[in-house]
Amino acid sequence: MIPVSEAQQKLQDLIDAVNQSHQPIAIAGQGNNAVLLSEADWASIQETLYLL
């Protein structure tokens, strides 16, 4: 998990990383957390959920 301040500074690099590795990156915010993943991986998850 990386802090939101680091994610802001490295956003393009993180976008490139999740697209290349297909591994999501957890981001720690102030009180809330989030996950960054590629659009292709998100679409795949949505398709899987639809089929269930």
Residue ranges and their predicted role:
Residues P24-L52:
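Short, charge-rich, low-complexity interaction segments located
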Residues V4-Q20:
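The conserved cystathionine-beta-synthase
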